[in-house]
Structure formats: structure tokens, C-alpha cells
């Protein structure tokens, strides 16, 4: 069964790779588009769901006390591309192309800030 078919059937909860993890970013965005999933649910396929399945309760989501590296994603020629990476609260990577203006957050009390 293809991953997108499993997601459509409600039985695909994790997208993972043992070879090229960078493809997971594109896979999450494709799952959102092709399976008509809200982006937060599609991103959970590559973040919180795998962490939960591996019993890694200290990571997988952005929350106080959790470990996290954070990326900002832009769209270059229709493809999601990492524009910035933060590790331990420090900017460690910035590409030479701009971030896409984010949509309003769906979570009450969450504020998005643009830098750069």
C-alpha cells in the first residue's frame, strides 16, 4: 500500500526514512495536499507521531521542556525548502532565499514572528 493510500484509509500515522530524511519535509507537504490534511496533522506524520511511537516523550512537538530543533520552510519553484534552522534556540542555518509569510496560527495564544 502506498503511504498516501494508508493516510487516506486512516491507517497511515507515520512517515519515516532510514535513508534520506530530507525528503520527509516534502512528504509532509505532499500528504497535506494529496490527502487534504491540515498542515499541522501532516507535519505530525514526521514529528510527534514517530516520537510517540518510539516512546520519546522529550521530543516531537514544540512545548516547554521538550527538545527541539526548528526549521522554517519556504516554497521555491513550488517545492518546500528549508530556509532557516534553529538548534537549542540558536540560528544555525540561513539559506539565501526568503521565508514565505506564515499563515495565522491555528492555536490560540501562539504568535509567529518573522526574522530576517
What is each PLM-predicted segment?
Residues 25-33:
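Short, small-residue alpha-helix embedded
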Residues 1-26:
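Short acidic/histidine-rich active-site segments
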Residues 29, 40-43, 47-116:
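Active-site microenvironment of metallo-dependent hydrolases
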Residues 36:
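H/E-rich (His + Asp/Glu) clusters that bind or coordinate divalent metals
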